[in-house]
């Protein structure tokens, strides 16, 4: 792999981006994510989508300092096409979402590399099952295409054995990679008088005596136990690199990276737990320093009055333009040799390119923040530790799309909501009105999430204060649609019911008291 353990060890940060076969299940009603959701509710809804779709490409860009050159960084960027391990009992099911396929196809995603040459991967639970089956000899070929190919191979080798002498060998060409381990495992289990070796040209099968076979199994460098460990290592595939990334404990940088973190946990660590707090603890243990460039750029964009941007590429363009006052004094970033594809070529939504943008944006924004502290440009002796210091308020604050809070805090309790207040809509002379009808009624003016409160009342919530003010003003004197600020103690049906019960109890108590006194 391009990214050795040593390269990760000496790196300052790792940019990450992941592409998926789908983003969200088309859930309806209460299962849809909304601005009303608490982080724990948002997590449980999104967890279903993460379990349904899979990762098709991971991009990593590892940034290291260039020795002897101040504030200069070199980026090693690489794409990994992934495909779930199909080995023994493992045969994952996953879905494609048409819009996601269309989107990636629009940007030139190579589905052949994903489906034909994807690197296998598994999480820790899957690895335990496979390890047990391989080491105990309970392993079986499960998929029909593999069974058919294995049958052809066994028939071919069996016919050859009938005429072969001890010491003779034959080659099975075109069998490479992980499949070669599978073929060898089956042949060794099925035929006691052969030995197999993997070479560049394919799997080499040699006829041997049973005594020689025993000797090879127990004394050679390719003895059974070591060989089975190699099979397991091959089956783990990208998961080996994931563990290297975890052990390196470097700052992990992404853009709107919440979905990336969910998939990293589910696909490479463990199945997502039902507990939202447990998920947060697990991620913080794996990656103690997370930085979401979406959270960082949100604040700096308002402060610097930069033009509005809608994606990571546009953020990068603004920071590389003359609009950035530190454009010429900021960190210099170069691409490593053999990683120079992106020097002249822009490849938006290619995972490694977006990972490179994440790391670059972070360094440039950090320099901008540092300059604002010193009030001079260039900043004297700017360094990555200084960058981390100014980024401290953003560490482990991951942006959250469409939820009751704007971000998740992975190193502690989540912050309270800073969304606009909830509004309450009271409807008159509109029998049978639905949430969908209410949504369409206001969508041209502003976008609200709608939740029914009673038969004729609905809660409205937006993520823009301006929209809340506008609709309150627009519908101030409307004859059939009355909109006001929602007050829990005033509008909640539960509170109203409780107050009514209390009123009845109080009235009965008062009546009993009066009747009791009159009886005496």
Curated annotation (Swiss-Prot):
Changing residue 259 to T: In SPGF57; uncertain significance. GO terms for cellular component: endoplasmic reticulum; endoplasmic reticulum membrane; nucleus. It is found in: Endoplasmic reticulum membrane. The chain crosses the membrane at residues 495-515. It is a single-pass membrane protein. It comes from Homo sapiens. Its cofactor is Mg(2+). The record marks 294 as: Interaction with poly(A). It is linked to Spermatogenic failure 57: An autosomal recessive male infertility disorder characterized by non-obstructive azoospermia, due to error-prone meiosis and spermatogenic arrest at the late pachytene stage. This is Poly(A)-specific ribonuclease PNLDC1. 3'-exoribonuclease that has a preference for poly(A) tails of mRNAs, thereby efficiently degrading poly(A) tails. Exonucleolytic degradation of the poly(A) tail is often the first step in the decay of eukaryotic mRNAs and is also used to silence certain maternal mRNAs translationally during oocyte maturation and early embryonic development. May act as a regulator of multipotency in embryonic stem cells. Is a critical factor for proper spermatogenesis, involved in pre-piRNAs processing to generate mature piRNAs. Belongs to the CAF1 family. It holds the Pfam family CAF1. Mg(2+) binds at residues 17, 19, 260, 354. It is an enzyme of class 3 (hydrolase). Its main location: endoplasmic reticulum. Its EC number is 3.1.13.4.
């Amino acid at each position: 792999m391009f990214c050795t353990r040593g390269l990760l060890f000496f790196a300052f940060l790792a940019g990450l981006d992941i592409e998926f076969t789908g983003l969200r299940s088309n859930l309806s009603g209460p299962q849809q994510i909304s601005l009303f959701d608490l982080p724990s509710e948002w997590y449980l809804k999104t967890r279903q989508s993460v379990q349904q779709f899979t990762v098709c490409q991971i991009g990593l860009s590892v940034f290291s300092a260039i020795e002897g050159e101040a504030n200069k960084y070199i980026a090693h960027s690489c794409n990994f096409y992934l495909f779930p391990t199909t080995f023994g009992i493992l045969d994952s099911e996953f879905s494609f979402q048409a819009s996601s396929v269309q989107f990636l196809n629009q940007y030139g995603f190579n589905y052949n590399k994903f489906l034909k040459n994807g690197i296998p991967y598994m999480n820790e639970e899957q690895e335990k099952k496979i390890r047990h089956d391989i080491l105990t000899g309970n392993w079986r070929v499960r998929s029909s295409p593999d069974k058919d190919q294995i049958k052809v191979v066994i028939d071919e080798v069996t016919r050859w054995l009938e005429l072969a002498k001890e010491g003779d060998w034959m080659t099975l060409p075109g069998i490479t990679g992980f499949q070669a381990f599978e073929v060898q495992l089956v042949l060794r289990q099925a035929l006691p008088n052969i030995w197999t070796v993997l070479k560049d040209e394919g799997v080499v099968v040699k006829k041997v005596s049973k005594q020689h076979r025993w000797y090879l199994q127990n004394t050679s460098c390719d003895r059974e136990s070591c060989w089975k460990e190699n099979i397991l290592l091959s089956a783990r595939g990208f998961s080996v690199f994931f563990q290297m990334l975890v052990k390196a404990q470097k700052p992990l940088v992404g853009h709107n990276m919440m979905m990336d973190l969910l998939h990293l946990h589910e696909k490479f660590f463990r199945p997502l737990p039902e507990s939202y707090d447990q998920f947060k603890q697990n991620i913080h243990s794996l990656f103690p320093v997370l930085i979401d460039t979406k959270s960082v750029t949100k604040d700096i964009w308002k402060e610097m009055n930069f033009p509005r941007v809608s994606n990571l590429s546009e953020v990068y363009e603004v920071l590389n333009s003359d609009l950035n006052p530190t454009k010429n004094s900021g960190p210099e970033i170069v691409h490593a040799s053999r990683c120079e594809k992106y020097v002249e070529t822009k490849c938006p939504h290619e995972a490694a390119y977006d990972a490179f943008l994440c790391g670059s944006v972070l360094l440039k924004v950090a320099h901008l923040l540092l300059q604002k502290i010193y009030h001079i440009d260039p900043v004297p002796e700017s360094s990555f530790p200084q960058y981390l210091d100014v980024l401290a308020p953003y560490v482990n604050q991951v942006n959250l799309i469409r939820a009751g809070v704007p971000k998740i805090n992975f190193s502690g309790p989540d912050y309270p909501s800073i969304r606009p207040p909830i509004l309450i809509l009271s409807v008159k002379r509109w029998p049978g009105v639905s949430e969908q009808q209410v949504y369409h009624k206001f969508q041209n003016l502003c976008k609200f999430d709608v939740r029914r409160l009673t038969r004729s009342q609905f809660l409205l919530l937006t993520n823009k204060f301006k929209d809340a003010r506008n609709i309150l003003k627009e519908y101030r004197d409307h004859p059939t649609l009355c909109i006001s600020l929602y007050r829990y103690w005033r509008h909640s049906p539960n509170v109203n019911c409780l107050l009514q019960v209390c009123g009845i109890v109080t009235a009965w108590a008062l009546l009993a008291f009066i009747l009791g006194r009159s009886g005496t």
